[in-house]
């Protein structure tokens, strides 16, 4: 059964927009996700399927523990963000909920950078 009248949110990374040392693999993979999102938004618009991407900055998750549980690394990372902190899962999930809401049905093919100002400080 094909989907229709729904929303898909893909996850990229803010690093694709600024270029960070030692992030070549994730940036190249996530840039592909952004292209997929834009193309899928166009392809599936006829089924009223909206496709968007969010690009978070560093967010406190199990995957980022090596940074967020290391005091020195955490302080350095916080300084990279204009809001002087790393993101929390709720910072990201709020935007996902917004994009999935059927009331917001005029948004498709977009990439939303949710990075606490990381991309503005580089």
Tell where the protein language model's regions lie, with residue ranges.
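Residue(s) in the substrate-gating loop at a strand-loop-helix junction
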Residues: 13
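Active-site "substrate specificity/gating" loop of NAD(P)-dependent dehydrogenases
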Residues: 19-23, 45-46
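A short C-terminal helix-loop "cap" of Rossmann-like NAD(P)-dependent dehydrogenase/epimerase domains
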Residues: 67-81
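A conserved structural motif in NAD(P)-dependent oxidoreductases
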Residues: 81-92
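Short C-terminal tail/terminal secondary-structure segment
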Residues: 18, 97, 108-122
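Alpha-helical segment proximal to the catalytic Tyr-Lys
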Residues: 42-46, 105
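Short, flexible catalytic-loop segment of classical short-chain dehydrogenase/reductase
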Residues: 51, 56-66
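Active-site helix of classical SDR
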Residues: 29, 37
């Amino acid at each position: 059964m094909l989907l229709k009248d729904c929303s898909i949110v893909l996850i990229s990374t803010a690093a694709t927009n600024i270029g960070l040392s030692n992030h070549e693999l994730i940036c190249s993979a996530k840039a592909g996700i952004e292209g997929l999102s834009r193309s899928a938004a166009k392809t599936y618009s006829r089924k009223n399927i909206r496709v968007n991407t969010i690009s978070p900055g560093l967010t406190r998750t199990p995957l980022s523990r090596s940074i967020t549980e290391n005091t020195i690394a955490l302080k350095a990372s916080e300084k990279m963000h204009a809001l002087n902190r790393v993101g929390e899962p709720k910072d990201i999930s709020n935007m996902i909920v917004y994009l999935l809401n059927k009331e917001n049905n005029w948004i498709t093919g977009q990439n939303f950078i949710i990075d606490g100002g990381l991309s503005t400080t580089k």
